[in-house]
Swiss-Prot record:
CC annotations in GO: glutamyl-tRNA(Gln) amidotransferase complex
Stated role: Allows the formation of correctly charged Gln-tRNA(Gln) through the transamidation of misacylated Glu-tRNA(Gln) in organisms which lack glutaminyl-tRNA synthetase. The reaction takes place in the presence of glutamine and ATP through an activated gamma-phospho-Glu-tRNA(Gln).
PANTHER family listed in its UniProt record: GLUTAMYL-TRNA(GLN) AMIDOTRANSFERASE SUBUNIT A, TRANSAMIDASE
Entry's EC annotation: 6.3.5.7
Record organism: Bacillus subtilis (strain 168)
Pfam family, one: Amidase
Subunit organization: Heterotrimer of A, B and C subunits. Interacts with BrxC.
Gene name tied to this protein: gatA
Family, similarity comment: Belongs to the amidase family. GatA subfamily.
Protein name: Glutamyl-tRNA(Gln) amidotransferase subunit A
GO biological process: translation
Keywords of the record: ATP-binding, Ligase, Nucleotide-binding, Protein biosynthesis
């Protein structure tokens, strides 16, 4: 049995009883990485020297002081688009191949305040653009459940590392499903918080109105622990919300009697695989057995979500990625005769194909002749999608459906068909457009590959999302299933 089979509360008890040391946890993490990461390829950079030194320091603090951080001694992996001082941050892109940040992201600082131990940086789709982690310039991360399949994306490294037992917890980012989709594919728990719940300061921007950092864990309880540690307003991020952070752990009561669940017919219709549909219907029976009720509803504008998302996110990416020019930091071409040539060649050589595709799409949508027809119209449709969610939440407590239309697909299966690849996020994208919280929890297997149940809540009501997810988790054994590596 791995130490990482224990929850945070159990690990903290073992530490305080002196049955294990924090150094043991860190050692377990690096040993596991050494044993399996040549197959999984989740990590891009390790911070072993600093992590081991910090673990020893925390070991001495077990008796040395009475107050300890919320995540005292817990090893964690961080997605490679979250800046870490003194630890290379590349966004899995050649254009940032040697970028060594001079500051920590707010979430990293909050992890340090909670006394977590950063193990290393995790692979991802370049600049978080992708659904399979096949767009990384450095590594091809594989799904621990089947090494021939993708782990999902863009936080594929974050989900795969937790599923493979390399770290018990990780941070990812979610712009259109990039935490929930890989969590579903890898059989772990992943939450996208409400937009503004967690500071984005130090998150390398893809689409600033959609990006949100969130936790990936083995259990719902651990997920709530991590969100507790990283949530809250931040003066360095004007989009972080000045709202109270509730005690998320207190919501894990297991009691969902009388809870009203909405199930959108669009989430179980055309394009959703039989296995995903059946796993959700089975999950609804479990929730009914716990005292909740459910009804079918409609989110009529969700059929426009995919097009809306790719217009808006690509437009924002076009603006955000303009800063990578070969002048200030990152990669610079050697094949330029003048300044304009330097810009062109640096970006042509430094960005991968998917990133260039989205920059071009965004630049086109923002151009003078097409702004009203595309970008402005997409903003209007986004408002309608948000209104659909608001209307449903007037009557219901949560929305439930599959996280993904299918389980993980084979590596290389969709790389030549961007539209098929984009459709993998069709059930997660509306949640980002509406800015509401959503979680994926394991709800079964199809041909040996995990499936995820998506639970969506009202703005800043992660507590109810956690309550439902935890009740389902406790009533089933899906979260106990682990891949054999």
């Amino acid at each position: 049995m791995s130490l990482f089979d224990h929850k945070i509360t159990e690990l903290k008890q073992l530490i305080h009883k002196k049955e294990i040391k924090i150094s043991d946890l860190v050692d377990e993490s690096y040993k596991r990485i050494q044993a399996v990461d040549d197959k999984v390829q989740a990590f891009l950079a390790l911070d072993e020297e600093r992590a081991r030194a910090y673990a020893k320091e925390l070991d001495e603090a077990v008796d040395g002081r009475s107050e300890h951080g919320l995540l005292f001694g817990m090893p964690i992996g961080v997605k490679d688009n979250i800046v870490t001082k003194g630890l290379r941050t590349t966004c899995s892109s050649k254009i940032l191949e040697n970028f060594d940040p001079i500051y920590d992201a707010t979430v990293v600082q909050r992890l340090q305040d909670a006394e977590a131990v950063t193990i290393g940086k995790l692979n991802m789709d370049e600049f978080a653009m992708g659904s399979s982690t096949e767009n990384s310039a450095y590594k091809l991360t594989k799904n621990p459940w089947n090494l021939d399949t993708v782990p999902g994306g863009s936080s594929g490294g974050s989900a795969a590392a937790v599923a493979a037992g390399e770290v018990p917890f990780s941070l990812g980012s979610d712009t259109g499903g990039s935490i929930r989709q890989p969590a579903s594919f890898c059989g772990v728990v992943g939450l996208k918080p409400t937009y503004g719940r967690v500071s984005r300061y130090g998150l390398v921007a893809f689409a600033s109105s959609l990006d949100q950092i969130g936790p990936i864990t083995r259990t719902v309880e651990d997920n709530a622990f991590l969100l507790q540690a990283i949530s809250g307003v931040d003066k360095m991020d004007s989009t972080s919300a000045n709202v109270d952070v509730p005690d998320f752990l207190s919501s894990l009561t297991g009691d969902i009697k009388g809870l009203k669940i909405a199930v959108p017919k669009e989430y179980l219709g055309e394009g959703v695989g039989k296995e995903a549909r059946e796993s959700v219907l089975a999950a609804l029976k479990v929730l009914e057995g716990l005292g909740a009720t459910w009804e079918e509803v409609s989110l009529p504008h969700s059929k426009y979500a995919l097009a809306t998302y790719y217009l808006l996110s690509s437009s924002e990416a076009s603006a955000n990625l303009a800063r990578f020019d070969g002048i200030r930091y990152g990669y610079r071409t050697d094949n330029a005769d003048n300044l304009i040539d330097l810009y062109k060649q640096t970006r042509a050589e430094g960005f991968g194909n998917e990133v260039k595709r989205r920059i071009m799409l965004g630049t086109f949508a923002l151009s003078s002749g097409y702004y009203d027809a595309y970008y402005k119209k997409a903003q209007k449709v986004r408002t309608l999608i948000k209104k659909d969610f608001e209307d449903v939440f007037e009557k219901y407590d949560v929305i439930v459906g599959p996280t993904t239309p299918t389980p993980a697909f084979k590596i290389g299966e969709n790389t030549k068909d961007p539209l098929t690849m984009y459709a993998n996020d069709i059930l997660t994208i509306p949640v980002n457009l509406a800015g509401v919280p959503g979680i994926s929890v394991p709800c079964g297997l199809a041909d040996g590959l995990p499936l995820g149940l998506q639970i969506i809540g009202k703005h800043f009501d992660e507590s109810t999302v956690y309550r439902v997810a935890h009740a389902f988790e406790q009533a089933t054994d899906h979260h106990k299933a682990k891949p054999e590596l």
